[in-house]
Structure formats: structure tokens, C-alpha cells
Amino acid sequence: MAKEKRVKGEWKRLTVQAAAFLLQNPKLHNFFLGTIDTGKTKVLCAPGLNCYSCPAAAGACPIGSLQSALTPRKPSFPFYVLGFLLLFGVLFGRWICSHVCPFGLVQDLVYKIPFPKKVRTFKGDRILRLLKYAVLLVLVIALPLFDTLKPYFYKYLCPSGTLFGAIPLTLTNPMLRGQIGFLFWWKVGVLVTLLLLSLLIARPFCRYLCPLGAIYGLFNRFALLGLTCDASTCEIGRASCRERV
């Protein structure tokens, strides 16, 4: 009975995740055209790590918007982006990560592939989780403040941008294929590594590297929509949680 409830709950979550993906990326035909939508809604942020360069995207990524606002070339205090993150953080916390983020959905689907050994936790797991705060402070905030031309997180690390933006655009746009170089293959390597790790570990990018998850995590304890665990009365949820919350 417990297993049936768990499976049913997982399918419900996958349904919400799929719906969230379509809401954030409604212009699917652009995948075949090799173009980026530039409609009026692109000035608005999506709640998840949804790449602006994704051909189907109807909005902007909040991390990308934050980086753009911090560049010295056109410095401005990111009132809108910070207000957006504050609002969604207070309302939902990391529920956004588990139910709305497109790359979170991809990792969940990969984790469902049968594999001989799934890793729930390991020595050093808690320390590695601090990496995402370093990514936020260094790659997203500090470095863009001193370099006008390099959005470091997206240029060197972001797997969501590679999967939903760079790869589809390169496949459908001959001009871009002619410009493929080391940086493209570096980001493909990062993406492949994270997807392979997703066979073993639930959401490795979310756990260890995602700066948006780091921001939402700051609100998790007092978000209106969140998860609580009373260890004094029940250990079932803690034992079965893939994320080891």
C-alpha cells in the first residue's frame, strides 16, 4: 500500500512538472525553426532555471536576469529580479525546484532508469551541498560585477542552457554549427557528466551546483508551501527521501 501511494505521488509530481515545462516553454515549434522567441513576455522571469535561449521559452531565467543587472556595462540594482525571487521564495521555497524546474524534471526522468546501485548519500555529501552557495556568490554575483562580457555561470556551467538552448539551436541553425568550438564541447561534457551522475544520485545538479536552488533554499524553512519532518514521531519519510532532506 505504501509503495502504491509513493508511485502514485511520483506520477502526480511528474504531471505537474510536465505542465510547468509547457507553461514556461509554450512555443515548441521554435525548436524546429532554430530561433529564439523575442516576444514581450521575455522581459518576465520564469520561476525555474528555464534558459532564455531555449527556442520555446516564453520568459527569462532569473539567474540570467540577475547576472545581466549586475554587469558594470549597464549597472542597475536588480529590484525586479530580487523582488521576484523574494516573492516566489516566500510563497514556495524549494517546491519550485521539485515541481517547476525543467532541468529538475530531466534529472528525475534519468534517475528513474534502472541502475544496479542508487546512491542515497555518501561521506562528504553535506559538505558538497555548500558548493551551490559558492556558485551563487562567485559565478553569479561576484565575477559579473567585475567583467562586463562574461556571464560565467551560463558560459561555463549551466546544463539547462546547454540542453534546452545551445544543443537545439546548434542542431537547427547551420550558422551556429560552423561556430562550434571548445566551449560548446566543454558545456556538453558538463551536461553529460551530470546526466550520468543522475543515474546514481537524485538531482546532482540541484543538490550541489544550482544557484537558483541555493536562493530558494534560504526561504525553505518559512515558505508558505513546504515540507516539514518531525523526526521524533516518524522516520519513514526521512528514510525514503531521495534528497535526504
Where in the sequence are the language-model features?
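Non-ligating segments of multi-cofactor redox enzymes
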Residues: M1-R244
